[in-house]
A protein has these predicted regions:
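C-terminal amphipathic alpha-helix
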Residues: 1-53, 99, 103-160
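A ubiquitous short alpha-helical element
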Residues: 49-56, 81-87
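Generic structural signal for short, flexible, solvent-exposed coil/loop and linker residues
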Residues: 6, 45, 59-62, 68, ...
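Short, solvent-exposed, charged loop/turn and helix-capping segments
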Residues: 65-86
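Amphipathic, well-ordered alpha-helical segments in soluble domains
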Residues: 27, 31-34, 38, 59-69, ...
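Short amphipathic alpha-helical coiled-coil/interface segments
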Residues: 56-63, 86-93, 121-125
Length: 160
């Protein structure tokens, strides 16, 4: 009584890590969604996305917060692989933000800067998916797999 076993200490540190990491992962995921929306706007709109500049500024702030949150994590040994992917997601999200900023004003959709942006967004998403497989509680939501997605009746003229 009152003495912690090695297993108990590890479990407690893992729970503390998971709690802190979940908050950071949610911030990364939300910011990834913001940057992906901004990228979609850049790629599909012929006009400059001046209204979206505020969204990009907020995304920049969120990217910095997410990176700081990940750097502050103290991963116990059992969470080292998970932490590796959290760092990867935060790093790639920073790259995506830099790339999104660089894409402003690009007129040609075949511009290499868009490739850099898309690659960084995809890599961030890949790292987030890896975190979902490594520890419980980090699963990403796939609305395409929701029960209503399979059973919802399709109306005439509604795509696939």
């Amino acid at each position: 009584m009152g003495v912690y076993s090695c297993v108990g200490v590890t479990e407690q540190s893992l729970l503390r890590y998971a709690d802190s990491a979940r908050t950071a992962q949610q911030l990364i995921s939300q910011t990834l969604t913001q940057l992906s929306g901004y990228a979609l706007l850049l790629l599909t709109s012929r006009r400059q996305a001046t209204l979206a500049e505020g969204a990009l500024a907020l995304a920049r702030q969120s990217v910095v917060q997410a990176a700081e949150a990940v750097r502050a994590l103290q991963a116990p040994e059992p969470a080292a692989h998970h932490y590796h992917h959290m760092r990867g997601a935060a790093d790639m999200l920073l790259e995506a933000c830099v790339a999104a900023t660089a894409c402003r004003g690009a007129q040609d959709r075949s511009d290499r800067r868009f490739d850099t942006l898309i690659c960084a967004l995809r890599a961030t998403s890949d790292h987030l998916r890896a975190t979902a497989r490594l520890l419980p509680g980090f699963e990403l939501i796939d609305f395409g797999q929701a029960c209503c997605a399979v059973h919802a009746p399709r109306l005439p003229g509604q795509g696939l």
